Every structure is written in C-alpha cells, then in structure tokens.
From Swiss-Prot:
<keyword id="KW-0486">Methionine biosynthesis</keyword>
<dbReference type="Pfam" id="PF04204">
    <property type="entry name" value="HTS"/>
</dbReference>
<feature type="site" description="Important for acyl-CoA specificity">
    <location>
        <position position="111"/>
    </location>
</feature>
<comment type="function">
    <text>Transfers an acetyl group from acetyl-CoA to L-homoserine, forming acetyl-L-homoserine.</text>
</comment>
<dbReference type="InterPro" id="IPR005697">
    <property type="entry name" value="HST_MetA"/>
</dbReference>
<keyword id="KW-0028">Amino-acid biosynthesis</keyword>
<feature type="active site">
    <location>
        <position position="236"/>
    </location>
</feature>
<dbReference type="InterPro" id="IPR029062">
    <property type="entry name" value="Class_I_gatase-like"/>
</dbReference>
<comment type="pathway">
    <text>Amino-acid biosynthesis; L-methionine biosynthesis via de novo pathway; O-acetyl-L-homoserine from L-homoserine: step 1/1.</text>
</comment>
<feature type="binding site">
    <location>
        <position position="191"/>
    </location>
    <ligand>
        <name>substrate</name>
    </ligand>
</feature>
<dbReference type="GO" id="GO:0008899">
    <property type="term" value="F:homoserine O-succinyltransferase activity"/>
</dbReference>
<protein>
    <recommendedName>
        <fullName>Homoserine O-acetyltransferase</fullName>
        <ecNumber>2.3.1.31</ecNumber>
    </recommendedName>
</protein>
<dbReference type="InterPro" id="IPR033752">
    <property type="entry name" value="MetA_family"/>
</dbReference>
<feature type="binding site">
    <location>
        <position position="248"/>
    </location>
    <ligand>
        <name>substrate</name>
    </ligand>
</feature>
<comment type="similarity">
    <text>Belongs to the MetA family.</text>
</comment>
<feature type="binding site">
    <location>
        <position position="163"/>
    </location>
    <ligand>
        <name>substrate</name>
    </ligand>
</feature>
<feature type="site" description="Important for substrate specificity">
    <location>
        <position position="191"/>
    </location>
</feature>
Length: 313
C-alpha cells in the first residue's frame, strides 16, 4: 500500500523506480480512509539517504501512511542543504500540538559524547516527554534507542573496545507480535561504538528482550504494550551502507576493521550480499500493524470516544 509524502521529496524518484507505491496529497485526500500519521525524527547526517531507507520499509506495510519529518532546531545540519530542511522538515514547535500514531527516532553519530553533551539533548528530552501523551508507539533506532532508554529510565550506554560493524545473526522471540512471521534466527546490520548491557535492563519489568545475539548482545527491546520499541541495529540499512562507512573511516585514517560477515571472504572489493532486507521489511510492517494500527485511536480529535489509548498513560 502507498505512503503519502511530498511529491517533491528526492526519495520519491528512487522509490518509484523500485516499484514502491507513493502518492501525493490530492490522490490520498480522495480516499475515504484515515491514514496513519507517522513522524520521523531524522538525526542522521545524510538526511536524504536515511529518508529513502525508512520510507522504503514503511511503504511495504498494507496501510496508507502520512509521513512527516522532524529535525532538532537546536542543531544545524552540516551535511544537508538548509533549503531541503526548510522544505521537507518541521520543527518541534510546529508539531507539538498534534497527535501521531507512530514516531521513529533514527540513530545519530554522537556516541562518543555523553548524552548531556549533545547539542540538541534538551530538545530531544522534550520530544521524548511529549511522545508519552501525543504518540501511540515510538520506534527508537541505534543511538536513538540508547538515548531513549537514558531519557526514560536513566540507563546509560557503555563504550565498546572496538566499533561493532557487520551483519550479525540474532535470535528472535517469535511469540511477540513484533517478530510474528520471523524465523528463529535473522540477520541485521549493526554499526556502533557503544552498547546497552543486558544486566542494566533486566530489572526494568516494563521492558522485554525480544532479540539477542552472541556476537552483538542486545538487539531489540520493547515495552510490554509495544508503545516503546528499541532496536540497536540498523535494519533499515541499504546493501552498501556498511561499505560506505568502512571506506569513509579508512579515508579518515581511523584504521577501521572490515565489517564482519559482510564482504565475501572479507574482500572489500566484492559486492556484499543482502541478507536482511526481508526481515527488515517484516519488522517495520509488524511495528506499523501490531504496535500502531491495531491499537491507536481512530479519531485523535475526539479521544474521549476511545478510552483504550488513555488506559496506557
């Protein structure tokens, strides 16, 4: 089913070339259904790349979605044109009086900093607090997951001895709706310098560990009501994203190790196999369907007609 986005967004041409169904406002407004409203807080430096990655998976869901992009006004992007941000993104002040069915918070390359040292940390905390009463389910990704846990529960991240980079096998709790239809094991890319330890969250009875791997530790956590989902990997990554990160770091003189389980025979000149796309599509689809669509109020403007939402607050 289609996603409803601005037809001028650069991702539209890419998605259309992949036979992914996108529609503009005029066509969507003539359909007599309520689309789900999804807000994406894009903290990644390459905004347009991340937009396409996220939208590609959201478009695989069987529901019509209206997507808005959010940026932190307390931070100035150095890698994306101001014109793009002004055209396609909203500030928190512009959305804070609205309700959203879902919120996606991406990763960010700020792991080396304490959370409080991130220049948009105070604004990020306001978004998290606002989401408790204005968003039905929030999907946190990588640093977004670590930051969400810290903002909500005070759980800190830990520095790893070396960067975790590669495609890793992890176990899935297929009894949970987020992993319905999954095999016992699935693969996903991970790319991070820090981690959240299992022992730091086992006493948080509101959270469940849904996916774990021997080589990369925690992969996915969620609250029991699925209003909070924390994914420490990057299921949204393209085939070549880890490759681009590797060569970027190599050029910068960081002496990176070759991403694990990625290049055939660790030959960096080969094309990496794409072995996580179907699992990623199913994960995003399950989140939209089971965590958002099946539970969110139909009429946000008249919440008294649907008290199920407020039972969670």
């Amino acid at each position: 089913m289609p996603i409803k986005i601005d037809k001028k967004l650069p991702a539209v041409d890419i998605l259309s070339s992949e036979n992914i169904f996108v529609m503009d406002d005029d066509r969507a407004d003539h359909q007599d259904i309520r689309p789900l409203n999804i807000l994406v807080l894009n903290l990644m430096p390459q905004k347009m790349v991340t937009e396409t990655q996220i939208l590609r998976h959201l478009a695989n869901t069987p529901l019509q979605l209206t997507i808005d992009f959010l940026y932190m006004s307390s931070h100035q992007s150095k890698t994306t044109r101001a014109e793009h941000m002004e055209t396609f993104y909203k500030t928190f002040d512009e959305v804070k009086n609205r309700y959203f069915d879902g919120l996606i918070i991406t990763g960010a390359p700020v792991e080396h900093l304490p959370f409080e040292a991130v220049d948009y940390w105070e604004e990020f905390q306001r978004v998290i607090e606002w989401s408790k009463t204005h968003v039905f389910s929030t999907l946190h990704i990588c640093w977004g997951a670590q930051a969400g846990l810290y903002a909500r529960y005070g759980v800190d991240k830990h520095q790893m001895t070396r960067k975790l980079s590669g495609v890793y096998s992890q176990l899935a709790d297929s009894s949970n709706l987020l992993f319905r239809g999954f095999d016992d094991e699935f693969y996903a890319p991970h790319s991070r310098h820090t981690e959240v330890l299992k022992e730091d969250i086992v006493n948080l009875t509101n959270l469940e560990i849904l996916s774990y791997g021997e080589d990369m530790g925690l992969s996915v956590l969620a609250s029991r009501d699925l209003r909070e989902v924390y994914s420490f990997g990057h299921m949204e990554y393209d085939r070549d994203t880890l490759s681009k990160e590797y060569f970027r770091d190599l050029k910068a003189g960081k002496n990176p190790h070759i991403p694990e389980n990625y290049f055939k025979n660790d030959d960096v000149h080969t094309t990496p196999a794409l072995c996580w796309s179907s699992a990623a599509a199913l994960f995003f689809s399950n989140w939209v369907n089971y965590a958002v669509y099946q539970e969110t109020p139909f009429d946000w403007e008249s919440p008294e007609n649907d008290v199920s939402f407020f039972a969670y607050l």
